[in-house]
């Protein structure tokens, strides 16, 4: 087990700067080349990392500036996967996402040109002299599985190449393990698995809408646990692996509701990660009680500061809530963060860059008061 001894943290995505948004629009319109876009990405990532360090963050990311989505870009980077469109996107509260998806077109495998590996290599190249930990966030294996069976067309595509789900789950786990080990070989010591599957499966209405049929929660939970843990077998001891369990974060809206209780006995008690990043920024998130299932010694990062709204939480309220959480998990194994990233997709949440950094400052300053 590898630990992070800093009690303030981030989830990882940041609002895309205007220059980057314009470059992506120009690339989509075929006004600039892929190399031109990459130059803008490189420069904006350099600026972001400098801001992260100046803010006092000890764990930094590239803001996911090269991605359109928090999850699909990673999926498209695996061998055997193609970029497709569905009739609908994901249904959020009062809003629907774009309708991109990922579909099987062959056996799934990791390849050495995966975009997340290339992204990390660049991040490392600009931070070699810095006293910070570099994090690479990737969507979880369970999230990949959920996308590949989302809707009848995706399911039909899977069946062309996989005769049973065991084989599919095994290939997903192996592709992910290969990606994680490649990141490690490139110098990464902090990998975070972003995972909406657990946050969605607690909400009967959401998942039934997405799959257009009923579902067996217990069966899904077993599959999610199996495919995630399958990717985490025999990893290096000095690699910290965490997971962020989300209920959806798109343009300041949410997708699912419900506390972590129904999934705690699986994900908290049995998933082989070092830390859990959990959303607790509103009443939809439920109580702290389920975190008692997290084994002693593992970290729980409390997402008490919302990334969806610009209004700043009161430090005293945050301190009170951390103390409440400490009734269920040791205070020294707790930390504070925003509830999610600021831009899980390139659209971003509805706040300004200045407001984003004020949120980060609030997290850091409050954590320093609690864990002085």
Name every feature range the model reports, one short phrase each.
Residues 1-372:
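Domain-level signal for soluble alpha/beta catalytic cores
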């Amino acid at each position: 087990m590898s630990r992070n001894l800093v009690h303030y943290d981030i989830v990882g995505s940041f609002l895309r700067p205007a220059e980057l948004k314009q470059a992506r629009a120009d690339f989509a319109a075929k006004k600039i080349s892929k190399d031109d876009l990459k130059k803008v990405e490189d420069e904006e990532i350099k600026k972001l990392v400098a801001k992260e360090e100046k803010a006092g963050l000890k764990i930094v990311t590239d803001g996911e500036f090269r991605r359109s989505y928090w999850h699909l870009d990673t999926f498209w980077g695996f061998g055997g996967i193609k970029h497709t469109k569905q009739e609908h996107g994901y249904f959020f509260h009062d809003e629907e996402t774009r309708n991109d998806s990922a579909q099987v077109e062959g056996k799934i495998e990791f390849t050495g040109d995966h975009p997340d590996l290339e992204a990390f290599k660049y991040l490392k190249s600009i931070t070699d002299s810095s006293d910070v930990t570099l994090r690479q966030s990737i969507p979880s294996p369970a999230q990949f599985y959920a996308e590949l069976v989302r809707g009848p067309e995706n399911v039909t595509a899977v069946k062309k190449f996989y005769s049973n789900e065991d084989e599919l789950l095994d290939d997903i786990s192996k592709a992910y393990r290969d990606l994680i080990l490649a990141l490690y070989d490139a110098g990464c010591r902090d990998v975070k698995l972003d995972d909406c599957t657990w946050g969605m499966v607690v909400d009967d209405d959401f998942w039934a809408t997405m799959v257009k049929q009923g579902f067996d929660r217990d069966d899904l939970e077993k599959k999610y646990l199996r495919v995630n843990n399958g990717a985490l077998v025999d990893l290096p001891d000095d690699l910290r692996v965490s997971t962020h369990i989300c209920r959806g974060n798109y343009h300041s809206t949410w997708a699912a509701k419900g506390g972590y209780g129904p999934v705690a006995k699986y994900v908290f008690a049995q998933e082989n990660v070092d830390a859990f990043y959990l959303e607790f920024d509103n009443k939809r998130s439920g109580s702290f009680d389920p975190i008692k299932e997290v084994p002693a010694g593992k970290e729980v990062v409390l997402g008490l500061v919302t990334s969806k709204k610009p209004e700043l939480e009161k430090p005293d309220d945050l301190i009170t809530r951390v103390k409440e959480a400490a009734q269920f998990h040791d205070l020294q194994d707790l930390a504070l963060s925003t509830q999610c990233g600021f831009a899980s997709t390139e659209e971003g949440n509805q706040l300004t860059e200045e407001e984003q950094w004020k949120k980060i400052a609030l997290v850091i300053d409050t954590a320093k008061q609690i864990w002085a």
